[in-house]
Swiss-Prot record:
The UniProt record lists the keyword ATP-binding: yes
Chain residues that bind ATP: T30, L31, G32, P33, K51, D87, G88, T89, T90, T91, G415, D496
Localization in the cell: Cytoplasm
Organism lineage: Bacteria, Pseudomonadati, Pseudomonadota, Alphaproteobacteria, Rhodobacterales
Keyword set, alphabetical order: ATP-binding, Chaperone, Cytoplasm, Isomerase, Nucleotide-binding, Stress response
Protein name, UniProt field: Chaperonin GroEL 1
Gene of this entry: groEL1
Organism encoding this protein: Cereibacter sphaeroides
Main location: cytoplasm
Biased composition (Gly residues): 533-547
Amino acid sequence: MAAKDVKFDTDARDRMLRGVNILADAVKVTLGPKGRNVVIDKSFGAPRITKDGVSVAKEIELSDKFENMGAQMVKEVASRTNDEAGDGTTTATVLAQAIIKEGLKAVAAGMNPMDLKRGIDLATSKVVEAIKAAARPVNDSHEVAQVGTISANGEAQIGRFIADAMQKVGNEGVITVEENKGLETEVEVVEGMQFDRGYLSPYFVTNADKMTAELDDVYILLHEKKLSSLQPMVPLLEAVIQSQKPLLIIAEDVEGEALATLVVNKLRGGLKIAAVKAPGFGDRRKAMLQDIAILTGGQVISEDLGMKLENVTIDMLGRAKKISINKDNTTIVDGNGDKAEIDARVAQIRNQIEETSSDYDREKLQERVAKLAGGVAVIRVGGMTEVEVKERKDRVDDALNATRAAVQEGIVVGGGVALIQGGKALDGLTGENPDQNAGITIVRRALEAPLRQIAQNAGVDGSVVAGKVRESNEKSFGFNAQTEEYGDMFKFGVIDPAKVVRTALEDAASVASLLITTEAMIADKPEPKSPAGGPGMGGMGGMDGMM
C-alpha cells in the first residue's frame, strides 16, 4: 500500500479552498447574458469553446492532490445539478463557492462546524420553500421561449425553436438535439409513433420518388414470432382483400417463401401490403409491440397467449389513418386506439421510469412514453464551423433542459433575483445557538453571489446591484444584465425555472456544508521520480588497478 500524506485543520482547509476557487473562478465567468466563453484544449481535433458550466467543470483536474479534492467536490455540485435539472450548473457552482468561503472563515474564527452546517441546512430548506411558493406555472409558448432564450445565453432563435418543438409534440414529447451538416438550425417534427425499422423489401415502395411505402387507412397485423409461411393466414388475407384496405405486417421477421409471396401479391396488385421487423429486442420488443397494439387498437398475436395465426380474424388487427415507411423508419400516424387505454399504458410506463435505476432503461422508457403520448421533434443545430456547432449544441441542450424544468415546476424571476427574494424568508429565522445563526447568515450572504457575478460579468459593480435589488419591496424587481436596466424581470422576459434555482441551491448547500465540516484530508504521497538515465553499470571484476 502506497504511503499517504495527511493534512489537518487550517492547512487542509486552505488547500481545499484553493482548489474550490480555481474551479469556481473558471466556471463563473460564463454566468449571465454577458458571460464569457471558456476554451478547452482537446488532445485531438480543434479546441472546444463553451459557456456551459458543467462542461468547464468536468475538464478541471489539478496537480496538487489536496487542491484537487476541493475542486472535485465542487465539480460534484455541477454534475448533480446537471443530472437533476439539466441547467443551473454555473449558479450552483457560484453558490457553493460563496458558502464554502464564508463557512471556512467562520470555522477559522472558532465556530463549531457542525452547528454551522445545521444552520446552513435550516436556512436552505426555508429558502427552497420560498422558491417553491413563488413559482407560477408556465402559461404559454411565449414564456417557454423566454426560458429557453435566457438559458441559451440570450439567443432568442434557440428559445423560439424549443417553444415551437414543444408546442408540436406536447410537454411529454421527445425532443432530441443533433448536429446539422448545413449552416441553418432547423426543427423537424415526426408526429405519431416512429420506430427504427424500415421495409423488408424495396418492392413494397409506393412512392418511387421518395422511396417510401405510404399506406392510408391501413390494417396492422402484430405478430411476435417469425413468419416463414403465409399458409396459416390465407383466410385473414382474403378478408383484408375484400375490405379493400392495405395491410402492414409487423413481425420478428418475414422470411423466404412468406416474403416472396407478399412481394408477388403486391406486384400483381391484388393486395396493398408492406412488412417490417418489430422494433427492439427481447423483452423490450414484446413491450413495444404491446405499445403499438394499444396505439392502434389491435392485439399482439402471441403464442404465449395461445393465439394461432389461422384463428386470427380481421377485428384483431390494429388500424391507423396513415403509415409511412422508408428504408430506415416506420411512422404510424393517428392510430385507432382507445384514449383511456393509451393513458393507462403511459401511466404504467411512467411508474417503471420511477422505479428503474438504469439511465439507459430510463431513456428508453421515456422514448416509449413520448411515442405513445405525443411525438418526436429533432432540433438540428447548424453553424459555420464544427467548433461553433458544438458550442451552440451545448446551449441548445441547456435551454431544452431548462424549458422542461419550467414546465414541471413552474417559473420564478430570473437573473439571481429569486434567490435574493427567497432569502427574505430568513428574516426572523434563528437557530438553537449563535453558531447556527452564523450558518443562516452565511446562506443569506451567499444567495446574493449569483446576481453579483451576473452584474460583474456585464461590467457593473455587483455589490451596488445586489444592494439595490435587496432593498426593493417589489418581488419581481431586478437587474437586466443584457440591457443594464432595473425593473420588472417578468416584463423583461428574464425568468428561470423554479426547479433549476431550487436544485442549484440544494446541491450547493449540501456539498458546501460537507466541505466546511472537514478536519483532515488524506491523499497518496507522490512517487519519488527515478533519475532519467539508465541503471548504473556494475563494477567490472579485476579492473580496479587500471586507474
